[in-house]
């Protein structure tokens, strides 16, 4: 769909991402353009309240914003109490495999930090870097080997595969995990040797109010004692209840699953 098609349809509002804002500024001449941040968890509650006002759903928006903020704060309190030296050093592939990893300030990184992990990319991408906040930063394989991550996570999925709510078949997630684990140059990494390569569904870490839930799954994996009272599946049920949909979270969200690691 092109922006010209949108203009022909003449919607009341156009909701767009920050990355695409430059492509559609001209639409603002004829359509009310809305561009808000609903991806990073610290902005989600405020963004939902604004949308609630715009679309005359203020009560629902207040309920969701309160739940989201409470969930976010609850998980953050746990991770804030974990000593920095006890937080494992990790890398996260988001949009593709190989040696491209998410940087600090991105929505994926915020899920990692909320789960009590240290992002190794922070060592080379600082807040004043043009790559800060990027979801894919290319590094050399030699650098990865030098850093020796304790865990490697990915939300990448072969376009021909499914995960998340779409299936209970783990083959797609397993394919991504195996692709990372089978990289011969990384065979001596602690993450590979210890079987600490995981797929987490992009739905849980890619924004839209779910980052705290993704962080709950990761936190439960990385710090089972500290996150003992957190039930990620229950948080997902609570989230789904806002959509009046089936509240039993069935699908492939984390692979290998938490149950497989017990």
Map each language-model feature to its residues.
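N-terminal ligand-binding lobe of clamshell/alpha-beta domains
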Residues: 1-262
């Amino acid at each position: 769909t092109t922006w010209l098609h949108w203009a022909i349809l003449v919607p009341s509002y156009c909701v767009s991402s920050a990355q695409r804002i430059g492509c559609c500024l001209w639409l603002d001449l004829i359509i009310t353009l809305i561009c808000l941040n609903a991806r990073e968890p610290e902005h989600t509650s405020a963004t939902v309240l604004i949308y609630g006002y715009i679309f005359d759903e203020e009560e629902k928006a207040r309920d969701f914003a309160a739940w989201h903020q409470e969930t976010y704060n609850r998980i953050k309190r746990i991770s804030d109490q974990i000593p920095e030296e006890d937080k494992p050093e990790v890398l996260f592939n988001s949009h593709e495999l190989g040696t491209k990893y998410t940087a600090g300030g991105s929505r994926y990184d915020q899920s990692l930090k909320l789960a009590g992990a240290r992002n190794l990319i922070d060592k080379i991408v600082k807040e004043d870097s043009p790559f800060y906040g990027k979801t894919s930063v290319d590094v050399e394989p030699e650098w990865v080997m030098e850093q020796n991550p304790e865990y490697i996570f990915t939300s990448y999925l072969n376009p021909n595969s499914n995960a998340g709510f779409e299936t209970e078949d783990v083959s797609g997630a397993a394919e991504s995990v195996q692709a990372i684990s089978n990289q011969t140059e990384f065979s001596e990494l602690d993450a590979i040797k210890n079987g600490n390569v995981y797929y987490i569904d992009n739905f849980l870490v890619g924004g839209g109010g779910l980052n705290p839930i993704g962080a709950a799954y990761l936190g439960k994996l990385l710090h089972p004692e500290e996150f003992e009272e957190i039930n990620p599946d229950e948080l997902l049920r609570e989230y789904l209840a806002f959509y009046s949909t089936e509240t039993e979270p069935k699908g492939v969200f984390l692979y290998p699953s938490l149950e497989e690691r017990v």
